[in-house]
């Protein structure tokens, strides 16, 4: 999604949100990420301005004080940015890939089933279409945010094809964006 993303070329406009819209977004975030409940007021303080940065390809990035927090495509689900995920790693369920998959994931490739079932990888129970953080064997922080394309049970049974779609990874265009004022 952000492989060829460039802030100067892809950002079309930025709008400040009304309080009623912010409440709706917070409720949507709570529904989507129940683990965020205790931390949402710390992530999105009440008095701080919340803005939506609109980009090409119908991508919207939610910012507070210029810090990029969540993004979504069209009116789809929100995904946390990796910077937010590194501060609050418990927001998303984790899946772990083996060392051999790291360079491919960091170049934007989707996570294949064998990379999740081999020694060194850890596959935790999760349903299809669940937003997950991708951890790497021997690494502390998440290297990618992805969406399960199959349930964990199906990944173990089939062990072929794409298991998790890579949505946002370290060093992609969104990672390099840092802040937006």
From Swiss-Prot:
It holds the Pfam family Pre-PUA. Coiled coil: none annotated. Its main location: cytoplasm. InterPro entries: MCT-1/Tma20, Pre-PUA, PUA, PUA-like_sf, Uncharacterised_CHP00451. GO terms for molecular function: RNA binding. Residues 92-171 form the PUA domain. It comes from the Eukaryota. One of its GO terms (cellular component) is cytoplasm. It is found in: Cytoplasm. SMART domains: PUA. Keywords: Cell cycle, Cytoplasm, Growth regulation, Transcription, Transcription regulation. GO terms for biological process: formation of translation preinitiation complex. The PUA RNA-binding domain is critical for cap binding, but not sufficient for translation enhancer function. Plays a role as translation enhancer and involved in cell cycle regulation. Belongs to the MCTS1 family. This is Malignant T-cell-amplified sequence 1. It comes from Danio rerio (Zebrafish).
């Amino acid at each position: 999604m952000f492989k060829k993303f460039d802030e100067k070329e892809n950002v079309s406009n930025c709008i400040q949100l009304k309080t009623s819209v912010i409440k709706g977004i917070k409720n949507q975030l709570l529904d989507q990420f129940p683990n965020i409940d205790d931390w949402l007021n710390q992530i999105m303080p009440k008095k701080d301005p919340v803005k939506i940065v609109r980009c090409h390809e119908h991508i919207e990035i939610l910012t507070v004080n210029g810090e990029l927090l969540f993004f979504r495509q069209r009116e789809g689900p929100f995904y946390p940015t990796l910077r937010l995920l590194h501060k609050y790693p418990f927001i998303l369920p984790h899946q772990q890939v083996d060392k051999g998959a790291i360079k491919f994931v960091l170049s934007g490739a989707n996570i294949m089933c064998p990379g999740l079932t081999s020694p060194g990888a850890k596959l935790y129970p999760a349903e299809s279409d669940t937003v997950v953080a991708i951890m790497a064997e021997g690494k502390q922080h998440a290297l990618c945010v992805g969406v399960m394309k199959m349930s964990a049970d199906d990944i173990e049974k089939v062990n072929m094809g794409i298991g998790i779609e890579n949505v946002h990874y370290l060093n992609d265009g969104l990672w390099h964006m840092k802040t937006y004022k």
